[in-house]
């Protein structure tokens, strides 16, 4: 069993019967990422913690299933439990800040961030560089860095210039770039996660 699946099961087994019922009801209305469907209501309401964990993992896969579970727990006011779930999911891989999804463990090389691991593919395939720059401006990029990247003539050269600043970045900075990529080019990120 994967770490994320175990963490989801652990969280759901620690809910009272009333909290589990509330969790399932919230799961029916929580906003989902594009491309994901809802677990059918009839099947969902009759499930225990173990069945629900299996259904979450089969419907949403481990990484997004854990993120979705943490979001629902947070909506229920169970911030501590949501934090524990995220910590257990990201343990040993350099925890991502709340709301930022880390790359799947199966695709990650020890010690390498998703951004570093897929550097060449990102340089070649990112098309919406301006959007990334706007998302990172003031948080990660200085005005001088922002202008230097924008001055490059092509998208690949802009991405190369952007990557020239990453050796000075910490995990949080790289997570912000990953989050911006997820928002602007989610299909590219999903494709790289599967590779």
UniProtKB/Swiss-Prot annotation:
Mutation: residue 45 to A; reported impact is:
Abolishes homooligomerization
Phosphoserine PTM positions read 195
Q: Outcome of residue 72 to A?
A: Abolishes homooligomerization
Indicate the cross-link positions, Glycyl lysine isopeptide (Lys-Gly) (interchain with G-Cter in ubiquitin): 55, 174
Mutating residue 68 to A: what's the consequence? Abolishes homooligomerization
Q: In which tissues is it expressed?
A: Widely expressed at low levels. Detected in peripheral blood leukocytes, lung, small intestine, spleen, thymus, colon and at lower levels in placenta, liver and kidney. Very low expression in skeletal muscle, heart and brain. Expressed in lung epithelial cells (at protein level). Detected in the leukemia cell lines HL-60 and U-937, but not in Jurkat T-cell lymphoma and Daudi Burkitt's lymphoma. Detected in the melanoma cell line WM35, but not in WM793. Not detected in HeLa cervical carcinoma cells and MOLT-4 lymphocytic leukemia cells.
Reported impact of residue 27 to A: Abolishes homooligomerization
Answer whether the UniProt record assigns the keyword Isomerase to this protein: no
Q: How is it modified after translation?
A: Phosphorylated.
Q: Which domain of life is it from?
A: Eukaryota
Domain (CARD) ranges:
107-195
Q: Where in the cell is it found?
A: Cytoplasm; Inflammasome; Endoplasmic reticulum; Mitochondrion
Alphabetized, the UniProt keywords read: Apoptosis, Cytoplasm, Endoplasmic reticulum, Golgi apparatus, Immunity, Inflammasome, Inflammatory response, Innate immunity, Isopeptide bond, Membrane, Mitochondrion, Nucleus, Phosphoprotein, Tumor suppressor, Ubl conjugation
Location of the Pyrin domain: 1-91
List the InterPro entries hit by this protein, alphabetically: CARD (IPR001315), CARD8/ASC/NALP1_CARD (IPR033516), DAPIN (IPR004020), DEATH-like_dom_sf (IPR011029), NLRP_Inflammasome (IPR051249)
Q: What is the effect of changing residue 174 to R?
A: Loss of inflammasome activation activity
Disulfide pairings: none
Q: What is the effect of changing residue 48 to A/K?
A: Abolishes homooligomerization
Q: Mutating residue 20 to A: what's the consequence?
A: Abolishes homooligomerization
Induction per UniProt is: In macrophages, up-regulated by endocannabinoid anandamide/AEA.
Main localisation: cytoplasm
Q: What is the effect of changing residue 8 to A?
A: Abolishes homooligomerization
**What more is known?**
In breast tumorigenesis, methylation-mediated silencing may affect genes and proteins that act as positive mediators of cell death.
Q: How does it assemble?
A: Self-associates; enforced oligomerization induces apoptosis, NF-kappa-B regulation and interleukin-1 beta secretion. Homooligomers can form disk-like particles of approximately 12 nm diameter and approximately 1 nm height. Next to isoform 1, also isoform 2 and isoform 3 may be involved in oligomerization leading to functional regulation. Component of several inflammasomes containing one pattern recognition receptor/sensor, such as NLRP1, NLRP2, NLRP3, NLRP6, NLRC4, AIM2, MEFV or NOD2, and probably NLRC4, NLRP12 or IFI16.
The written remark on domains in the entry is:
The CARD domain mediates interaction with CASP1 and NLRC4. The pyrin domain mediates homotypic interactions with pyrin domains of proteins such as of NLRP3, PYDC1, PYDC2 and AIM2.
Under which name does UniProt file this protein?
A: Apoptosis-associated speck-like protein containing a CARD
Say which species the protein is native to: Homo sapiens (Human)
């Amino acid at each position: 069993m994967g770490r994320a699946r175990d963490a989801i099961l652990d969280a759901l087994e620690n809910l009272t019967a009333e909290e589990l019922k509330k969790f399932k009801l919230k799961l029916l209305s929580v906003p989902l990422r594009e491309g994901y469907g809802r677990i059918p209501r009839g099947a969902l309401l009759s499930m225990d913690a173990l069945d629900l964990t299996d259904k979450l993992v089969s419907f949403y896969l481990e990484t997004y299933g854990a993120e979705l579970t943490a979001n629902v727990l947070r909506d229920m006011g169970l911030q501590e439990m949501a934090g524990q779930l995220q910590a257990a999911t990201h343990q040993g891989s350099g925890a991502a800040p709340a709301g930022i999804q880390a790359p799947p463990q199966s695709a990650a090389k020890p010690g390498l961030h998703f951004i570093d691991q897929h550097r060449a593919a990102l340089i070649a395939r990112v098309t919406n560089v301006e959007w990334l720059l706007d998302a990172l401006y003031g948080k990660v990029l200085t005005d001088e860095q922002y202008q230097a990247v924008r001055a490059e003539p092509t998208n690949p050269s802009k991405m190369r210039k952007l990557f020239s600043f990453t050796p000075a970045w910490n995990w949080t900075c790289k997570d912000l770039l990953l989050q911006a990529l997820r928002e602007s080019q989610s299909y590219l990120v999903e494709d790289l996660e599967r590779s």
